[in-house]
Amino acid sequence: MGGLTLFAAQGCKAPKQVAEQAKHPNIIYVFPDQYRNQVMGFWNQEGFRDKVNFRGDPVHTPNIDTFARESMVLTSAQSNCPLSSPHRGMLLTGMYPNRSGVPLNCNSTRPISSLRDDAECIGDVFSKAGYDCAYFGKLHADFPTPNDPENPGQYVETQRPVWDAYTPKEQRHGFNYWYSYGTFDEHKNPHYWDTDGKRHDPKEWSPLHESGKVVSYLKNLSLIHI
């Protein structure tokens, strides 16, 4: 699971200054890893089923259904490479995999596949527009290097090839709040690196933990920018 949180907080400005600015919408983009379009229960419900030319699977997804009713649902958005790293490269840069720098799933045997440092990503664009930008969960768009914050000169894991990766601040493309990892599939035992590079091992089911972190982030930021 991964998510971009783009919060329209224009810094700590006086109320009059904030009121004079054009109102920007807050944006939360959630992308699971990975669902077929049909495995969302809301596609069989009123208000949704007549908007698409397929039938949803007979599944029960009450939380996703509620989220859909409170969100903007795109009925014809397609990924031309629905694979972990290439898709994230496209999402972040707006480029095809052969241009984003991420044509393959990233691991230590594939230096050819890593998000371009010179790419202007969605986080860069929103940050320049005054947004407070956060990234939560799986990134899997960087070539792993021996840059473990707690063990300089070492990779963040011992298995080979190395899949997991730590993303340093200079490679976060506008995301000023960070709670992420490269790729790690033990979702009952996840880990994350925060904005300052400290590792967290919460011992909690990853979707539940990440959702809680997102909610806390939004609540705290709302209080700061009242």
Q: Residue locations for each model-derived region?
A:
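Formylglycine-dependent sulfatase
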Residues: 1-224
